[in-house]
Each structure stands twice: as structure tokens, then as C-alpha cells.
Amino acid sequence: MQQIRKGVYPTMITPYTKDGEIDYAAVRRLTEWYIEKGCTGIFAVCQSSEMAFLSLAERVKLAATVTETANGRVSVVASGHCAETLSEQAKEVREIAATGVDAFVLVS
């Protein structure tokens, strides 16, 4: 098991377009901003990112966008505890893990 870096992990907000869609270009810019400011890692999918209001597809794409943008320069953490059944929860864990995040927070 690989350990994630110790340090500062801000909880990331989710920027939206005027149409109420996730603004993935802004997500990439925000990720770069956190890295430029010296953060050790980013908590990408969390309560601050309004994860409870995002679909599974949006949560997965958000985690993937941050992970791809960070490209190993910082650790990326995601959370996933929005599912209502155990099978849905397992699916969420698998899909977010497949994005390459460095750590996953699961609240049961």
C-alpha cells in the first residue's frame, strides 16, 4: 500500500456554469491554483464540492478531472457515500477508484 503525502488538503468547491452544469475547465484551473499555492493534496469530491447534489457520473468525472489535472503532482482524495444501497455504494467505490485517486473516504 502506498501512503499519501502528509500536509495541507483543502476541500475543493465545485464551480458551475451559468446553466448549472459543472464547469470542468474551471475545475482544471482551480486544481492548478491549489497546486501553485503549495497544497500537498486536494480533497476533490467531498461535502464542500456539493457531492450529495451530484450524480454518480458527475462525481466520477469530477474526481477524474482533478486526478488527470494533478497528474501526480499532488495527492487527490475523493469521498463517496451518497449511495442508498450496499451494491450502489460498491459501484461508486469501484468507479471513483478507477479514476486513479490516491485515497478514498467512505463514511458508513
Identify the meaning behind each predicted range.
Residues Q2-P10, T14-S108:
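Active-site beta->alpha loop and helix N-cap motifs at the rims of alpha/beta catalytic domains
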